[in-house]
C-alpha cells in the first residue's frame, strides 16, 4: 500500500481546500408580494412568476 513520503504542510492543505466553500443562495425580489424569495420556488404567499398558484402557508 502506498504511503506519502512527506507530511502535507498546512499551506498546501489550505490551498487545496480553498475551493471547498458553500455558495450563497440566489435570492430575488418578488414585486407581486414585496418579499425576497429563492429563484424557481413558490413564495410563502403562494406566488410563482407573479401568479397565485397555491394557498398561503398558515402559521400554526
UniProtKB/Swiss-Prot annotation:
Keyword Ribonucleoprotein (UniProt): yes
A single GO molecular-function term is:
structural constituent of ribosome
**A Gene Ontology term for the protein's cellular component:** large ribosomal subunit
An example of a Pfam family matching this protein is: Ribosomal_L32p
| Keyword Ribosomal protein found | yes
InterPro entries named in the record:
Ribosomal_bL32, Ribosomal_bL32_bact, Ribosomal_zn-bd
Q: Which keywords does this Swiss-Prot/TrEMBL entry list?
A: Ribonucleoprotein, Ribosomal protein
| One GO-annotated biological process of the protein | translation
Q: Which HAMAP family match?
A: Ribosomal_bL32 (MF_00340)
Which family, according to the similarity comment? Belongs to the bacterial ribosomal protein bL32 family.
Name the chain's protein.
Large ribosomal subunit protein bL32
Amino acid at each position: 500500500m502506498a504511503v506519502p513520503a512527506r507530511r502535507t504542510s498546512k499551506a498546501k492543505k489550505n490551498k487545496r481546500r480553498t475551493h471547498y466553500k458553500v455558495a450563497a443562495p440566489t435570492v430575488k425580489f418578488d414585486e407581486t408580494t414585496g418579499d425576497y424569495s429563492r429563484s424557481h420556488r413558490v413564495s410563502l404567499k403562494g406566488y410563482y412568476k407573479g401568479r397565485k398558484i397555491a394557498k398561503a402557508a398558515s402559521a400554526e
